Every structure is written in structure tokens, then in C-alpha cells.
């Protein structure tokens, strides 16, 4: 399977997972409200979706790195490093939550808690940085411009969300949620279309 084909399928899968996560989150907010903690079974569904999306996001960024021209591969490499940290952190948090924490008879991440802080660091800072560094890979016009702008917006919103836990106001963190739960699935759909339309793309040499 070519890098573009792999990128297309993984980006499409990320978009669909994002829709599923957003729908689940909407249900959670309608049931529990914005301030109340989300509990099982809705929380368990969200954690499983997160565990699936973490390695998929690594595949998406890897495909972006493969797509980059030679003089822009450094951006793809930096993005890949940041997304790998993100995936490891969030996977560890949710694996522990789904196994050890529940076997102790408890569940849920309520702020402030160490596990929740690690989770927000992963999704806000490290995912946000990965998206921001992935954006310069797409230097062209047309579809590439749309992907570049989407990555910049999503990444900036994710990073901005770190202000919430930093100041202890979790309503401010909703900016980050909008970045990765709403904007990112749209960007992944644009990525899937770009990779699909450019199956014969070969990494270009530096100008």
C-alpha cells in the first residue's frame, strides 16, 4: 500500500472517529451538562474511541511526512515526534482508566487530577504542536491551502485550550475541544481527499 493510499484511509478513519466522538460528547453534555463529570457508559465509549484514534493519528502524520517535499520534511518529522508523544500519553491514560482504575471500582477523570492533567497536556499541547508543524508541509494552492489552514486553525485552538487547566478554568479548555473534536475531523476529511486525488505523488526534491 502506498503512503498516499494509507494516508487517505487513515485520515478518513480519523474523520469518522471524530464524528463518532463528537456525537458521543454531545450526548454526554446533554445528559450531564457542561460542568458535571462524564461517567460510564458514555465515558467508556469516549475512552475506547480515544484509544483507537491515537495510533491512527500517528499514521496520518506519518503519511504527511512521507508526502512532504525534501525541503519541508523537517516539519513533517517534528510533527511526527510530537504526535508520537501525544499518542503514547493519551493511550497510557485511557488504558489505565479502562483497566486498573475500573477494576478498583472507580472511573472518571475529574479535574483536578494527575491523569486528567496528562490527558490535557497530550491533546492540547502535543497534538496542537504536531498539527501546527504539519501545516507547512502543504505549501501549495488549492486543496493544499485548505489543508494547511485547517491544520493551523485546529492546532492553534488545541494549544490555546491548555490555558484552561493552567488557570483552573475548564470552560476555557473547551476551545481545545473545539479544535480536536470539531475542526480536526474536517481537516482529516480534506486530507483524505487530497491523498486520494494525489495517489501518484512522489516526494519532491528541494528547490
Positions of predicted regions on the chain:
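Hydrophobic, aromatic-enriched alpha-helical segments typical of multi-pass transmembrane helices
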Residues: 1-207
Amino acid at each position: 500500500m502506498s503512503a498516499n493510499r494509507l494516508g487517505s484511509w487513515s485520515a478518513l478513519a480519523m474523520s469518522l472517529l471524530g464524528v463518532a466522538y463528537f456525537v458521543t460528547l454531545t450526548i454526554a453534555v446533554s445528559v450531564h451538562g457542561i460542568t458535571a463529570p462524564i461517567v460510564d457508559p458514555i465515558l467508556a465509549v469516549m475512552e475506547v474511541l480515544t484509544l483507537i484514534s491515537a495510533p491512527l493519528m500517528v499514521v496520518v502524520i506519518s503519511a504527511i511526512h512521507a508526502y512532504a517535499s525534501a525541503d519541508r520534511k523537517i516539519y513533517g518529522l517534528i510533527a511526527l515526534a510530537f504526535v508520537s508523544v501525544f499518542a503514547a500519553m493519551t493511550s497510557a491514560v485511557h488504558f489505565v482508566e479502562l483497566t486498573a482504575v475500573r477494576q478498583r471500582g472507580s472511573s472518571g477523570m475529574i479535574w483536578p487530577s494527575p491523569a486528567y492533567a496528562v490527558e490535557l497536556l497530550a491533546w492540547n499541547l502535543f497534538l496542537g504542536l504536531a498539527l501546527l508543524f504539519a501545516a507547512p508541509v502543504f505549501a501549495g494552492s488549492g486543496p493544499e491551502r485548505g489543508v494547511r489552514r485547517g491544520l493551523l486553525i485546529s492546532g492553534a485552538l488545541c494549544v490555546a485550550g491548555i490555558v484552561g487547566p493552567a488557570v483552573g478554568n475548564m470552560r476555557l479548555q473547551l476551545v481545545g475541544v473545539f479544535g480536536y473534536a470539531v475542526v480536526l475531523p474536517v481537516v482529516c476529511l480534506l486530507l483524505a481527499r487530497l491523498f486520494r486525488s494525489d495517489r501518484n505523488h512522489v516526494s519532491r526534491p528541494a528547490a
